[in-house]
Amino acid sequence: DIGNFSSQGNIHYEVKEIDDDITEDIWWEAKFLDAIKNTEGTISKWGESPITIPAGDCTGEGNTPDESGSETPTDPVSYTYVFEDNFPLVGDYDFNDVVLDVETYYHREKKTNHIKRIQLDVTLAAAGASKPLGVGLRITGINKSDIREVKTGGDDSRFQESFNSSYNKFRYNNVTYMEDSDPSVVIPIAGEVHNVFGVEPGEMVNTGIGVTAKKYTYEVIIELADQTRTEPPFSKDNLDFFICYQYKSMEQRMEVHLYEFWGYGATAAGTIQQENLDLAGNNTWAICVPYGFRYPKETINVSRTDIPEASAYPEFIYWAQDRTQYTEWYEHPVEENVYR
């Protein structure tokens, strides 16, 4: 100990600043650090501790939990997903055929910090497609046995009614809220996106042309089979949102996935056609971007090299070709060419 201060146990310190009197005396600084450090803990710079306690009703900004057994949701992890339906062709490449705003909440038990359920709020923000499109979610890295139950909320009736559409390509189970006959976790989100908005397929919604409509949210609440986890069994990197549609007379639905998930192939009821991937190369027809992304207006190409100012995000094409370059392309729009 040093002076009247002593420390023992598994304690993690974050040091915001050290008084000048200490830093000017090497011997004193060493004694100070020895006094607060122990073999079970760590000393970190402010904000860099390896241990964090989520903020909540019982912890405030990180206090000792109380004895309550109730739950508190963490702040959401939020992203926007935008899709182009002309895969593997370029088309208008405006990335507004389907726009999803997604927020993920982890519901934790206050006392133990155990994750009880994970809630995905999937908001359908726009439908700029000229053909019927469905939306699904495959969660990679987990099994159906990892899920105790799936419940829904929000505007769920609008989304679920869309599975009655003649354009629906999902084998939707209205008890499990997952897709039948698929060993993977596949959760249908919308049988037909225009149907959710209450318009006919082909009607543009919230793209600057056509209809301006209210956005609707499908709450997907996944109760975990293992109720003792403190680390989530899946994260944004496992959320394989995709769009799908009927292609000619094919029995399987055509699916458009994020580039990051091409290696997983299609779901059991879908196809992506390997020749399409070969043709696509490094291009992409679905991207995950920061929440609230201002997507291109209808018919505005996301990126052009010939007339950059006529596109929505001139730097996008360079990022698509090499994802280590122009990684903040989405922060530099051509203002008059983006929506919201």
Can you annotate each of these PLM segments?
Residues 1-340:
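Extracellular distal adhesion/interaction modules in secreted or cell-surface proteins
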